[in-house]
A protein has these predicted regions:
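Histidine-acidic metal/acid-base catalytic patches
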Residues: 1-83
Length: 83
């Protein structure tokens, strides 16, 4: 989320700077809401790029759910990021 807002080109930024990244956050862009297939960011590709760097740390689901069931939104986000 933060990288897209600040710089864009997420996968290039991950590849260029992964040695300096300690953890990642997810959130839908725009709006910082649930992550899904309608957002600016395609998290399956992003997660594959993160995985390809050998990252062994944490990925925080840090979004503000709009739907009525926050746990269901979290489950969908985890499933989307499970590559």
């Amino acid at each position: 989320y933060h990288m897209q807002i600040s710089e864009g080109d997420i996968i290039r930024t991950i590849n260029d700077n992964h040695d300096f990244i300690g953890h990642y956050h997810t959130a839908g862009v725009p709006g910082r809401n649930e992550i899904d297939q309608t957002q600016e960011l395609f998290y399956p590709a992003i997660m594959k790029a993160i995985s390809a760097t050998g990252f062994k740390g944490f990925v925080a689901q840090e979004f503000i759910p709009k739907g009525p069931n926050p746990l269901q939104s979290l489950k969908k986000a985890i499933d989307l990021c499970d590559v």
